Amino acid sequence: MKETAAAKFERQHMDSPDLGTDDDDKMSPATSPFLATPRTAGIVGCPFSGGQPKAGVHSGPLQLIESGLLNDIENLGWTVDFAGADALAVSIVSDTPDPDIGRLKQPRLVSRVTKDVADRVYAHASKGQLTVTLGGDHSLAMGTVSGTFKAYPEACLIWVDAHADINTPHTTESGRLHGCPVSFLLGLDGTSSEEIPEFSWIKPCLKPERIVYIGLRDIDAGERKILKDNNIKCFSMFHVDKYGIGKVVEMALDHVNPDRTRPIHLSFDVDALDPSVAPSTGTAVRGGLTFREGHYICEAIAETNLLVSLDIMEINPSLGALASVAQTVDVGRSLVRCALGETLL
């Protein structure tokens, strides 16, 4: 029988010596005004692919964990609270019919799983833990952001992605909910409980001025109108090229967190990175962030000491050769390490 990630985690921690070193403090951020001590990373593994059509993205969390992510986090001085990458498997398997609602595909499944994720994220956040959610497709952000904002109503959201993921049930062409989470979080037209009671658990928690995008380069026409109509701040790859990533991150923070007092939720879709950096993802778009640009975003946010929740989404180990998969998983691990305080010096 294949060893589960949870069992492997338990075995490693029972059998392995403490990996902490005297250099831990050099890699650790200063004290957070929001997180409890000792610093604990609450890991939420989400092996879920129901928000999009490509098989394999559900394997992302297990690949990250089996590659050594939990030890990476511990080596940075964090305590790890982890219940197993397959913790949501029961919620995902269902024989219940799930017909389309309008254009939306598998809406009941997505709703059930994302509500479960919201509860899990909130449980970690309410204990003062920094939640690290491993996807899985980006529809999961309906749950992760909802859970974070329930614990921190004054939080802000930094969304790093090639795509805006802000289609509504009326504007989506594909009907895939990984392209819609932000519209539900904002409570846009077509997302109300009166129109889609299956998602009545989602309470609009996000204000347009509390979200900023970095890395956009593939936006649907309907999304472009939504972004303009709601005056949502966006930094596309044009802005990254024009100003440089350092200035872009500074401007992004100035917009959503001008006084640097609000908790930050960072939702990072690896397709924000150029396909040469993260090839094994379902909706890759050329012309993305470089390796260093992606990592700088995480480093700069870690430097604020305001990060309370992190998503790493859309790693798909079924796409590409083994070397491409290993490269993408390794990038996912290093993004998490940088967001949790790893520095060179």
Swiss-Prot record:
Native species: Glaciozyma antarctica (strain PI12)
CC annotations in GO: cytosol; nucleus
Temperature dependence: Optimum temperature is 20 degrees Celsius.
Cofactor binding: number and manner: Binds 2 manganese ions per subunit.
Residues annotated as binding Mn(2+) 2: H124, S126, I232, C234
Stated name of the protein: Arginase
PROSITE patterns the record matches: ARGINASE_1, ARGINASE_2
Renumbered residue ranges of the record's region Disordered: 1-34
Primary role: Cold-active L-arginase that catalyzes the hydrolysis of L-arginine to L-ornithine and urea, an essential reaction in the urea cycle for toxic ammonia removal and cell proliferation. Is not able to use D-arginine or L-canavanine as substrates.
Keywords, sorted A to Z: Arginine metabolism, Hydrolase, Manganese, Metal-binding
UniProt note on regulation of activity: The enzyme activity is increased in the range of 20-50% upon the addition of Mn(2+) (1 mM), Co(2+) (1 mM), Ni(2+) (1 and 5 mM) and K(+) (5 mM). In contrast, the addition of Cu(2+), Zn(2+), Ca(2+), Mg(2+), Fe(2+) (both 1 and 5 mM), and Co(2+) (5 mM) strongly suppresses the arginase activity. SDS (1%) and EDTA (1 mM) are the most potent inhibitors. Reducing agents DTT (1 mM), PMSF (1 mM) and beta-mercaptoethanol (1 mM) also significantly inhibit activity by 85%, 64% and 35%, respectively.
Biological or metabolic pathway of the protein: Nitrogen metabolism; urea cycle; L-ornithine and urea from L-arginine: step 1/1
pH dependence: Optimum pH is 9.0.
